[in-house]
């Protein structure tokens, strides 16, 4: 059962700094963005680690106890699936590098694997990707005026349905 979903935005990139639409262009984090995700990753990892410790302190019966034949058994599945972990955590991210950098800042601290999924990519801005708003206005003023209709790109609702 899923009891919590947390979505994070990646840290800053050079395109963010230049106010460019990056969409699905694979731009890595800049040094500030890496610092941002390191801070966020540490805070999240601390939150989940201490939440787990507190749950186990309140409910010590949740700690998996080996049965009498444990020393002779080689099947570890029952212990891997035991509730001692408190909750099963899954870290999923877009396949874009900036998103992977962000996910790993959290997951690596807790020793969790990161699963990449292209469907989690940012919204597509079509041919406007990599351009600033001023550049878009200069070459496509009429199209820019219809920005709210997202002509030539993916709508916000398209992103929501993918996520």
What is the predicted role of each segment?
Residues 1-6, 89-90:
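Extreme N-terminal starter segment of soluble prokaryotic enzymes
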Residues 5, 17-20, 27, 120, ...:
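N-terminal hydrophobic or amphipathic segments with adjacent small-residue motifs
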Residues 11:
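Active-site metal-binding loops of divalent metal-dependent hydrolases
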Residues 14-112:
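Active-site-proximal alpha-helix that buttresses catalytic centers in soluble enzyme cores
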Residues 108-163:
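Phosphate-handling substructures
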């Amino acid at each position: 059962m899923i009891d919590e979903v947390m979505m994070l935005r990646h840290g800053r990139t050079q395109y963010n700094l230049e106010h460019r639409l990056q969409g699905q262009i694979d731009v890595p984090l800049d040094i500030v963005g890496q610092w941002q995700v390191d801070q966020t990753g540490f805070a999240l990892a601390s939150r989940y680690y201490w939440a787990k410790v507190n749950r186990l302190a309140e409910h010590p019966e949740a700690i998996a106890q080996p049965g009498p034949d444990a020393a002779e058994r080689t099947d570890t599945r029952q212990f891997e699936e035991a509730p001692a972990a408190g909750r099963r955590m899954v870290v999923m991210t877009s396949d874009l590098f900036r998103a992977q950098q962000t996910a790993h800042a959290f997951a690596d601290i807790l020793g969790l694997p990161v699963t990449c999924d292209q469907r989690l990519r940012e919204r597509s801005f079509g041919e406007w990707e990599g351009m600033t708003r001023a550049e878009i206005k200069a070459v496509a003023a009429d199209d820019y005026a219809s920005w709210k209709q997202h002509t030539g790109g993916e709508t916000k609702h398209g992103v929501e349905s993918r996520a």
